[in-house]
């Protein structure tokens, strides 16, 4: 049975939020301000799930999705919304979370940072699975809210040269003896050739190695093999091919390995660093802490302008990489690094640090609750 609803807002997953006789309904495919006819797909005590059957009154910001896999692939959830409106919708979700979850209101909202909407991803984890009823091996993102792998022929958010590899990768994996024991291919891009990391649960035999080498030559990529955790990743042959990127505005070059964390969108990353530097308003006598510093993405620009910079990160390999990047940019005498689990720190932890008068905190999605609780009262 079809139900007519008015979409009041959008959640962080891109679902429309409506009310039906006072009950919250999450509507797949609905946009804020629209009137839609929906079909209820799941009913829970406190909410319902629904999908749009017909848009009766469309949003002026509704657009035709550019990706042929939109609606099935879970990689993107808001392509039916104009790109600028997507940014505004995400900002409203953030403000709502501050209000309803954090019980706070932002005193100031900075202008959003925007970059290219297509071909921007320089990092991705692609699932690999043989599905006989779909014709063989699938390589791609998961289907929306599912553990199934989407049947993808292309991906518009990947660089075109990498999107073009999806079908050849399917053919390659289909031929591997370890086809059913290779669950993931991780892609990472710097300013050189793409790197592909094959996660394998069994040793790779000589015949499979030969196929991987042939793929390297034909498609101008480099392979890494990862038998266990990220620290076990190693190049298929020869020396490790270190990836790199440049922050042109600061004259800094960074090196990293394909399994080490970097920002997905290099264009946005450059703008984020610029924004952070403006907000810090650095003076030559500042002593700055950079928490969750990673490989030194923010640390090194800060070190160029501050008297002392202290980068802290939970991953020892990333701290080693940060030190290498500092040395490579001639900043070793202006920066120091330390390994610390920033999710488990004592209340007096800040008292154990070198003297600092400014902090930059760039946590992962898990947040920085322990850090915030330990902040000195004057911070």
Feature names for model-found ranges:
Residues 1-65, 69:
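Terminal RNA-binding accessory module
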Residues 148-183, 189-193, 202-227:
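Internal alpha/beta scaffold segment
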Residues 30, 39-43, 127-131, 188-190:
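Short beta-strand micro-motifs enriched in acidic
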Residues 53-65, 71-182:
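Extended interfacial segments that mediate partner engagement and assembly in macromolecular machines
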Residues 16-21, 140-143, 322:
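Short, acidic/hydrophobic/Gly-rich beta-strand patch recurrent on exposed beta strands
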Residues 12, 175, 203-379:
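Rossmann-like S-adenosyl-L-methionine
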Residues 37-39, 125, 289:
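Hydrophobic beta-strand signal
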């Amino acid at each position: 049975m079809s139900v007519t609803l008015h979409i009041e807002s959008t959640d962080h997953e891109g679902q429309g939020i409506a009310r039906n006789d006072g009950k919250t309904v999450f509507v797949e495919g609905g946009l804020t301000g629209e009137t839609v006819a929906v079909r209820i797909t799941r009913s829970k005590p406190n909410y319902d799930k629904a999908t749009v059957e017909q848009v009766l009154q469309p949003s002026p910001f509704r657009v035709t999705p550019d990706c042929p896999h939109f609606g099935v692939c879970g990689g993107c959830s808001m392509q039916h919304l104009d790109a600028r409106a997507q940014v505004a919708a995400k900002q409203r979700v953030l403000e709502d979370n501050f209000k309803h979850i954090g019980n706070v209101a932002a005193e100031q909202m900075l202008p959003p940072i925007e970059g290219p909407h297509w071909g921007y991803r320089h990092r991705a984890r692609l699932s690999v699975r043989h599905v006989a009823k779909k014709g063989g091996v699938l390589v791609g993102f998961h289907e929306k809210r599912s553990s199934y792998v989407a049947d993808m022929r292309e991906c518009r958010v990947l660089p075109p040269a990498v999107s073009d590899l999806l079908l050849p990768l399917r053919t390659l994996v289909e031929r591997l003896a370890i086809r059913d024991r290779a669950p993931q291919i991780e892609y990472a891009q710097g300013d050189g050739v793409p790197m592909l990391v094959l996660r394998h649960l069994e040793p790779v035999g000589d015949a499979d190695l030969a196929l991987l080498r042939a793929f390297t030559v034909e498609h101008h990529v480099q392979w890494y093999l990862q038998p266990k955790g990220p620290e076990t990743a190693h190049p298929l042959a020869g020396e490790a091919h270190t990836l790199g990127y440049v922050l042109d505005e600061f004259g800094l070059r960074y090196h990293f390995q394909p399994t080490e964390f970097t920002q997905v969108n290099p264009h946005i990353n450059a703008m984020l660093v610029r924004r952070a530097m403006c907000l810090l308003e650095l003076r030559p006598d500042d002593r700055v802490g950079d928490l969750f510093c990673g490989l030194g993405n923010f640390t090194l620009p800060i070190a160029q302008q501050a008297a002392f910079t202290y980068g802290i990160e939970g991953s020892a390999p990333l701290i080693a990489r940060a030190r290498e990047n500092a040395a490579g940019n001639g900043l070793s005498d202006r920066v120091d690094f330390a390994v610390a689990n920033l999710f488990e720190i004592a209340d007096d932890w800040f008292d154990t640090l070198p003297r600092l008068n400014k902090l930059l905190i760039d946590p992962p999605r898990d947040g920085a609750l322990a850090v915030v609780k330990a902040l000195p009262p004057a911070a």
